[in-house]
A protein has these predicted regions:
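Enzymes that bind and transform nitrogen-containing heteroaromatic metabolites
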Residues: 1-203
């Protein structure tokens, strides 16, 4: 429903203008917007228990999905015209990794209980040539990158409308209650004819 508000077109044009060839989504956002397949229902197998990297394809950009335990199903190895690359924790089942390999999907498994985003960013840079990464949500993965100190800019499209449905998450969500707020510095503000605003901040 949110995409019915003015500002959705500006959102995608802003992404294009930012020239970010690699973007990352969280599991929930990916389930809604990236994959149409049902969740993985096979035997995931024994937990991996160690760091692992599989590069199925060289590319100038990737569609990255953070899926801690390996639950999403995939039809093929591409999404949005880019090769898929899945971030997982070391708790992922070994059979799920073989499933990804059979689909021609790259993956990075790092972090004992949850994905080690800082280490994953290092591997994305050194192993996959990713120099710029756009973090497109949802709120949990956005907050994870924020907490790990991996964001240098926040880009927000403010649409002239309100979505007040129960359960709709914020752009940043999931940090402990005692976490300090993060101060931002305005870089630019752009208005559109439909009333939408594009705000860019540095951290």
């Amino acid at each position: 429903m949110t995409e019915k508000l003015a500002g959705s077109e500006e959102y995608y044009s802003a992404i294009k203008e930012l020239e970010i060839p690699t973007v990352i989504f969280g599991r929930v956002t990916a389930q809604m917007e990236v994959t149409s397949e049902p969740p993985f229902s096979g035997d995931a197998g024994e937990p991996l228990g160690k760091e692992a990297v599989h590069k199925a394809e060289n590319a100038e950009g990737y569609t990255v999905v953070a899926d801690t335990r390996g639950t999403l199903g995939w039809r093929e190895g591409k999404a949005d015209g880019r090769p898929l690359l899945i971030l997982l924790s070391e708790r992922v089942g070994q059979n799920y990794l073989r499933y990804l390999e059979s689909k021609g999907i790259s993956y990075i498994a790092t972090g004992k209980e949850r994905i080690d985003l800082a280490r994953a960013a290092e591997i994305l840079y050194s192993g996959f040539g990713v120099q710029r990464l756009g973090v497109e949500g949802g709120g949990t993965v956005n907050a994870g990158f924020l907490a790990a100190g991996l964001l240098d800019e926040i880009s927000i499209i403010l649409a002239p409308g309100i979505d007040a449905r129960c359960g709709m998450r914020a752009s940043f969500d999931g940090l402990p209650p005692g976490s300090e707020p993060v101060r931002l510095k305005l870089l630019s503000a752009k208005s559109f004819d439909d009333g939408a605003l594009w705000l860019r901040y540095s951290l």
